[in-house]
Amino acid sequence: PDRHWYGNLPEILLEKRGGGVDAMIKKIDQAARTYPYSDSYTIWPGPNSNTFIAWISRAVPELQLDLPPTAIGKDYLNPWFFSRAPSGSGYQFSLFGLLGILVSPIEGFELNFLGLTFGFDLDPLAIKLPVIGRKNFSPPASSLYALD
């Protein structure tokens, strides 16, 4: 990560290594080249930088990226109303990023209202709230196996 964004420390959302990474890089490059809003930017409700990352993630489902609930613009699907979830593991309905619903094994259940995300996730158990983001109540199941 590079620098603070509105006083917040940057965080790494995803890191991939090993076999298949070169193929993912090619798919990411292709998705970036076909991004339909490269000449457009609107802070709210999108398209914006979060819309771009969600576009890439949908095009490369192997990333299984779970964007944070604070990523306003991730739900902007215009002109489409129905799409895969950004993680590629579920589905999403959205009216111009202003009103929508997302259901996915990776992202959980999310309601989007005026670009703000409300929801919950089961692995790890968490609640998702606007401004606050994600509040985990338990560690991911995958990390429990690391304790053995």
Enumerate the predicted regions with their spans.
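Non-catalytic ligand/cofactor/substrate-binding and regulatory segments of enzyme domains
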Residues: 1-45, 58-60, 83-148
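Catalytic cysteine-centered active-site loop
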Residues: 42, 62-81
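Solvent-exposed loop/turn segments at secondary-structure junctions
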Residues: 48-49, 72-74, 98-100
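Non-catalytic, well-ordered alpha-helical segments in soluble enzyme domains
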Residues: 50-63
